Regions:
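Generic structural signal for hydrophobic core residues of well-folded globular domains
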Residues: 14-17, 47, 84-87
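Short, amphipathic alpha-helical interaction segments positioned at domain boundaries
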Residues: 62-97
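Short linear capping/connector segments at secondary-structure termini
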Residues: 25-30, 58-64
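Short amphipathic alpha-helical interface segments
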Residues: 1-32
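Short amphipathic alpha-helical interaction segments
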Residues: 33-50, 54-57, 70-71
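Short, solvent-exposed secondary-structure capping/transition elements
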Residues: 22-23, 56, 92-96
Length: 97
């Protein structure tokens, strides 16, 4: 269940950042979210794959068992906004955290 909390939190932060001229990418980093780098990389990779976020580079390498992720200019997409709006379960989890 924590994975959905992290997904919602990342999307919510990116949604709020739409009003900002500059965005501090550390706000959605694994240290700020207090999760492992492998879990964070997999979550961010899934968010990009599902087209909930953009401005992220994801690739795989032989020396690492999880995806490598580079935050270039992360932004929430229309799909991500719809996910936030439609997913009431995530709202409940986010508010309970």
């Amino acid at each position: 269940m924590d994975n959905f909390k992290y997904i919602y939190r990342i999307l919510k932060i990116l949604e709020k950042s739409m009003d900002l001229e500059e965005f501090d990418m550390e706000l959605i980093g694994y240290k700020e979210l207090d999760i492992s780098k492998p879990r964070w990389s997999r979550i961010v990779s899934m968010l990009k794959e599902q087209e909930y976020i953009q401005g992220i580079d994801v690739w795989y390498s032989l020396d690492q068992d999880y995806p490598r992720v580079k935050l270039v200019r992360p932004e929430i997409t229309l799909n991500g906004l719809e996910y936030l709006n439609e997913n009431s379960m995530m709202k409940k989890v986010y508010n309970a955290a």
